Structure formats: C-alpha cells, structure tokens
Amino acid sequence: MDKNYNENLNYIEAWSVAVNALSGKKRENLLEDGFVSSAKGYKVCYITEIKNFTFRGLGFGEYNLSSSSKCEKKIKKCSITVNLNCDCGFYAFYDQSKAFNLAENYRGLVPIEVELYGKIIMHKDGMRGEEQDVIRVFLSRICSKGYCNREGIYLSKKVSLYNKKKKYLVRCEKHKSNENFMISEISKDKIDIVRY
C-alpha cells in the first residue's frame, strides 16, 4: 500500500480520535454553565518550526507559543471566537494520559501542556478556548522512526510527500535528516522541554 496513503490515514485517524473526544458534537457533556476564563490542559500537535516554536494541530492551522483563535469557517453566528454554534478554538484534554496515548499510537505527534484563556467551553473530557499559551513540550526519549528504539537526540525535519507539510520528529543519529536540531541545545528560555 502507498506510504503516503498510510501517513495520511494515520493523520486522519488521530485527528478524528481527538475531535470525537472533545468536539462540540457532545454538547450534552457541557458543565452547568459551560464557561470558564482560564484552564490548564494537554493536547497533541506536530512541531513545524524550531526557532520560533510553531506547532500544527490536528484540526486547523498553525499556532505559536502564545496564540488567539479565529473562526476558520467564517460562520456568521461565530462573531465571538468561541461559542456553541461553531467548533473553532483551541482544544485540550483535562487528562494528560489522553494526550500521551494519542502520541504513543501515532509517532510524530508531540504531547504539549497548554493554558487556555478567554472564553472557554468545558466538555466532559476536555475544553475549547479562545486563547492559548504552550507552556511545556514533551519529547520522547526514543527515535520516532518505525520500530527504532535508539535514543532520540535530534529534532529532524521531515516533509510529507502527500501534502508537502513539514514537521520535526525525534530522531536518532542513524535516522536524522539533513536539517536537525540537537534537543539538548534547543533554547530552554522560551519553553520548558521535558523528555519522557
């Protein structure tokens, strides 16, 4: 089977697992009033830029260490960024283990810890917020290449043959690409990096 097809299928599968767990389709899971103003959560993403720390979520677009959401669908009822009529915003799980389970099942995904601000809608398993700060990035200690179990010491650039999108993956010496960053040398003053 085509490698690009499998990569795209894994991406769609991971995205649907996350969306099904958190999406606005489960409106009956809202808490009493459904809104809070700040909360900590966990999610998964791809790292797309190292120097400026840019991430790509499983749903819409890219974001930085500190970002505000906007309606990607341009729905008239969605004049306020986060509301019950739209699915836009930054999603996060309450439970750290849900993000780590997704990352373990789909190599290349990176669990991160975030703080959501602004208008936040609370659901049974997670939340959706207006603004987001990435406060911690969790990087695997092992190489993300297939069944390799060597120590991952680099973040290596990989460009998808399917959609030409780039991401940085944890790689060992043997599987590193031409564009690499040593994990130990990445600036820790911008973000807390935790190895697991």
Question: Over which residues does each language-model region extend?
Answer:
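Cys/His-enriched microdomains
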Residues: F138-G146, K167-V170
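Short Cys/His-rich "knuckle" micro-motifs
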Residues: E151-L161, N180-I186
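Long, low-complexity intrinsically disordered regions enriched in Ser/Thr/Pro/Gly
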Residues: S187, V194-Y196
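ADP-ribose/NAD+-binding catalytic cleft of ART/PARP-like enzymes
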Residues: M1-C88, F100, E104-D125, K145
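Short Cys/His-rich metal-coordination motifs, predominantly Zn2+-binding knuckles/fingers
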Residues: K145-E151, H175
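Long, amphipathic alpha-helical segments that form or neighbor coiled-coils/leucine zippers used
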Residues: E130-R136
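Cysteine-rich micro-motifs
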Residues: Y162-E179
